[in-house]
Regions:
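A short, proline-enriched helix->beta-strand linker immediately N-terminal to the Walker B motif
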Residues: 170-174
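Hydrophobic anchor residue at the start of the ABC signature
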Residues: 165
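Conserved ABC ATPase signature
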Residues: 151-155, 159
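Conserved ABC transporter NBD signature motif
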Residues: 75-89
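Conserved ABC ATPase "signature" region
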Residues: 85, 118, 126-147, 199
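Catalytic Walker B motif of ABC-type/P-loop ATPase nucleotide-binding domains
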Residues: 176-179
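Short coil-to-helix segment of the ABC ATPase nucleotide-binding domain corresponding to the Q-loop/switch region
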Residues: 107-116
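Helix-to-loop junction immediately C-terminal to a conserved catalytic motif
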Residues: 67-70
Length: 281
């Protein structure tokens, strides 16, 4: 008699998902068209999928639908499932890091990071000692353990994004949604944040969907890269077998290799076709 465990449902599944803004009016705009994909629940680790596409093609709309945010949800058509269950709104299993700095200005770094734990302590079954331990642990991991009592206006842009990442990961979400989190940073800080993300992702075993406008960043961070069409957005190309970053290795050590540069050119060639409105194989 077989004792094999039944297969896990996909960690994320989109079934024919579409989104139309202002339907039935002169301002009607079709943002997403027939989005279909499954992301498997891999044992011991999650995938990081980088999402690129022209401006206004619905990348952020797709993330916001998956997050269940009220401003976007529900989709106009189709269904979104997380681990086999329909998404009906926000949940602790999904965390999000935005492009704009999203810390509460009146709270310290420490208070910002513990905000979600305090808000959901009953759901998470956490007592004060564990909340404090988790917060201090994650602030140390993102290199802010010496800045606990500072306020957001006292931090650099990179430090503010470290706060946002710690606040997201401290809740231990199964899915992390990142909407151009490093685009406002200068190049050295951006590279350092890429390195930090690789190290933290190796620890948390979460599935990450990362929207970025940088092909280099997408190829460096992604297990897979998805390219979106012009609006209405849909996935028109997927790239796999990309050079894999390793914890502790500076991004430039990978990004200057021939294999990495070749992968960037492959993605760039298709991206140029999309922007020109040419068909994609």
């Amino acid at each position: 008699m077989s004792t094999a465990n039944p297969p896990l449902p996909p960690v994320i599944e989109f079934r024919n998902v579409g989104k139309i803004w202002n339907p039935g009016t002169r301002r009607e705009f079709k943002a997403l068209d027939n989005i279909n994909f499954c992301i498997d629940d891999l044992p011991g680790r999650g995938e990081m999928i980088a999402i690129l596409g022209p401006s206004g093609c619905g990348k952020s709309t797709m993330l916001n639908l998956l997050a269940g945010f009220q401003e976007v949800f529900p989709p106009t058509s189709g269904e979104i499932l997380v681990r086999g269950q329909p998404v009906t709104g926000p949940g602790l299993d999904r965390g999000m890091v935005f492009q704009k700095y999203s810390s509460f200005p009146h709270l310290t770094v420490y208070e910002n990071v513990r905000f979600g734990l305090d808000l959901n302590r009953d759901k998470l079954g956490l007592e004060e000692p564990e909340i404090d331990r988790r917060c201090r642990e994650w602030l140390k991991k993102v290199g802010l353990d010496a800045h606990l009592e500072k306020y957001p206006h006292q931090l650099s842009g990179g430090q503010q994004q470290r706060v946002a990442i710690a606040r997201t990961l401290v809740v231990k979400p199964r899915i992390i949604l990142m909407d151009e989190p490093f685009s406002a940073l200068d190049e050295p800080t951006r590279l350092e944040m890429q390195r930090l993300l690789v190290e933290l992702w190796a620890e948390v075993e979460a599935t990450v969907l990362l929207v970025t406008h940088s092909i280099i960043e997408g190829v460096f961070l992604g297990d897979r890269v998805w390219l979106f069409s012009r609006a209405p957005g849909r996935i028109v190309k997927e790239f796999r077998d990309l050079p894999a970053p390793a914890p502790g290795v500076h991004p430039l050590q990978v990004q200057r290799t021939p294999a990495f540069l070749e992968a960037v050119e492959r993605v760039s060639a298709v991206f140029r076709k999309i922007e020109a409105g040419e068909p994609v194989d």
